[in-house]
Regions:
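Short, compositionally biased
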Residues: 42-48, 78-89, 145-165, 185-199
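C-terminal amphipathic alpha-helical interaction region
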Residues: 539-588
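Short histidine-centered loop motifs in beta-beta connectors
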Residues: 52, 57, 119-129, 159-167
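Metallocofactor- and cofactor-centric catalytic cores in central/energy metabolism, strongly enriched
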Residues: 45-48, 70, 155-159, 233, ...
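N-terminal accessory targeting/assembly segments
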Residues: 1-104
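P-loop NTPase nucleotide-binding/switch module
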Residues: 97-153, 169-229, 243-246, 281-300, ...
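Short, surface-exposed secondary-structure boundary micro-motifs
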Residues: 20, 34, 70-71, 89, ...
């Protein structure tokens, strides 16, 4: 028997019921005659507090509230990929057919198509013992991704009957099992899972493999591990969304969950348009076939914004349990924190710093701690990597969301508006950014790319830091007073900035660069530095070295050397040797 109650008070998205109405904490409820979706967030003997995930305009005291007896849950089955949902996993395509461009209040649609038939290949037989997470069937969801239908994490038993291979809807029975207590359970392709509860795993692994993004400053200088967490803070116009789009397009994750949380609707439109036209470089299939979008844009109800991150995480953990590597793009966690602040204000809670609730840090940690490289219940290995954009007002990194986020992420890609306004993209400021995964991943780089990879990376960072120190002197008294070896540092740092850190998202070779090419580019830049330093130690001035235009040719490598032609780097070494010899001959 589900609980029933009547509205006693309304305060924006917050609804109050008088007395103890028999509801459970976090229970999903239907509010009012329009049956708006809500969730129980507070219970006392005097009143029940509910947050409503839809617009509450027109609700009146006395209207009924009906419980469902279950928490707010995500529907997990084939059909998630290529779909676009709102914050509580309602399909926007189906809603658009029913109510047009805007979501009507109280509209209900199945999260996934219950009429579409999927071809299921059964992987179990009668009499098999099934444990939690065991794969009972395989369904080709897209050309690149095989959906594995699993036993729910809270169920196990012996197989009593199995359906034949064939076409089934997501609700038709596939396997009947006998549980430990002797009762029978019917398994279909569909599972339900509460969005606020992490799905269980066997064990968690330390970081050991990088999430390769094709962006040089990320992969080489500040790498992110598979199963890791990263924050991209930056002011307005610094390129947070573009950075996340680039990672969503080119990273070597199997599946991308893109959560548009409180940002502009046009950004989601851009993802839909671009991803449908681009092909995955690994499989050759459209990028949209490995992507799911959760759109909770700035004009949608605030309460659903808070739920959208948990919905996306639950979908990601479901695919992780199949053995896939999933990357979540959350754009932006600041808008999510603002939703927490607004709801906290409605609940009349004591505000903390800048009006955010005192539990902001614990909510952020609940979100980021669901990332990780894990061994699943079925023995497979999967990961969830989280990349969260942070939008501090005025680009001030000392505000609470950025500061609390830094506590829970191990990778920090701070965007700089001065770099962005100078048209340097990605606008990641190399002096303030960091990655704590570098030591964990150094063994992987040395084994899979080159033994010198980490050493070269550290030398690049050292040169950039030297440039920063020298620029303070240059700003005061100019560069002419510097000795030639320091002038060379400034020139090589310019080559690193323009030829390595800067990247063109619209160039076919420069938009995504393989690690082998990244290493070769570092090698050439440092080879040029060593040769020039040798010349300067013999008394050659930097002005003579700059006459040959060798620095400009090295900067242009990113365009001139195709990604599939690493052999061309030998020609650049020869050019640098020829440059060295010609300078020696002319000044002998």
């Amino acid at each position: 028997m589900t609980a029933q109650g009547n509205i006693y008070g309304i305060n924006g998205p917050i609804i109050y019921l008088k007395g103890d109405s028999g509801f459970q904490m976090n229970e999903m409820v239907y509010v009012g005659t329009g049956r708006l979706v809500g969730e129980v967030i507070g219970l006392t003997s005097e009143r029940t507090t509910i947050e409503v995930y839809e617009e509450t305009t027109g609700l009146k005291p006395g209207e009924p509230v009906a419980g469902t007896g279950a928490p707010v849950s995500a529907t997990l089955a084939p059909g998630i990929l290529t779909s676009i949902f709102d914050g509580i996993e309602r399909p926007l395509n189906a809603i658009q057919k029913e109510s047009g461009c805007y979501i009507d209040r109280g509209i209900h649609a199945d999260s996934l198509d219950t009429k579409k038939k999927w071809h299921a290949h059964m992987t179990v037989k009668k009499g098999d013992r099934l444990y939690p997470g065991a794969v009972i069937a395989e369904v080709p969801e897209t050309r690149a991704i095989t959906h594995k239908v699993m036993v729910p994490p809270d169920m196990e038993g012996f197989v009593l009957s199995v359906a034949e291979d064939g076409d089934y809807t997501i609700e038709e029975p596939l396997v009947t099992i006998q549980k430990k207590d002797g009762s029978e359970a019917v398994l279909s392709m569909t599972q339900k899972w509460p969005i606020r509860i992490p799905r269980p795993v066997s064990r968690r692994y330390p970081a050991s493999r990088p999430l390769i993004t094709g962006q040089r400053i990320v992969d080489t200088l500040f790498p992110l591990a598979k199963g890791g967490t990263a924050a991209i803070p930056g002011g307005f116009g610094t390129g947070k969304t573009m950075m996340q789009h680039q990672i969503a397009k080119w990273s070597d994750a199997d599946i991308i969950i893109y959560i548009g949380c409180g940002e502009r609707g046009n950004e989601m439109t851009q993802v839909l348009e671009e991803f449908s036209q681009l092909d995955d470089p690994r499989t050759g299939n459209p990028l949209m076939e490995r992507t799911t979008l959760i759109a909770n844009t700035s004009n949608m109800p605030v309460a659903a914004r808070e739920a959208s991150l948990y919905s996306g995480l639950t979908l990601a953990e479901y695919y992780r349990d199949m053995g896939y590597h999933v990357a979540i793009m959350a754009d932006s966690t600041s808008r999510w924190a603002e939703a927490l602040r607004e709801l906290s204000g409605r609940l009349e809670e004591m505000p903390a710093e800048e009006g955010f609730p005192a539990y902001l840090a614990s909510r952020l940690s609940q979100f980021y701690e669901r990332a990780g490289m894990v061994q699943n219940l079925n023995g497979s290995e999967g990961s969830v990597s989280i990349i969260g954009a942070v939008s501090p007002q005025g680009g001030d990194f000392s505000e609470p969301v950025t500061q609390n986020t830094k506590r829970f992420v191990r990778c920090f890609w701070g965007l700089d508006k001065n770099l962005a306004y100078a048209r340097h993209f990605p606008a990641i400021q190399w002096l303030t950014s960091y990655s704590e995964y570098l030591t964990d991943l150094s063994g992987w780089y040395e084994t899979n790319v080159d033994k010198s990879f980490v050493e070269y990376r550290n030398r690049l960072v050292m040169l950039l830091n030297q440039e920063s120190s020298l620029m303070e002197i240059v700003k005061l008294i100019g560069s002419d007073v510097l000795p030639d070896d320091q002038k060379l540092v400034l020139e090589i740092a310019r080559v690193i900035r323009l030829g390595f850190l800067q990247q063109n998202a619209f160039h076919k070779d420069d938009t995504c660069v393989p690690l082998k090419k990244q290493f070769k580019m570092m090698e050439i830049i440092l080879y040029l530095y060593e040769k020039c330093r040798a010349l300067i130690s013999m008394g050659m001035p930097v002005s003579v070295l700059k006459e040959e235009k060798i620095f400009e040719r090295v900067i242009a490598i990113r365009y001139d050397v195709p990604n599939d032609r690493p052999d061309m780097f030998d020609g650049y070494k020869k050019q640098i040797d020829d440059f060295y010899n010609s300078v020696m001959e002319r000044n002998a």
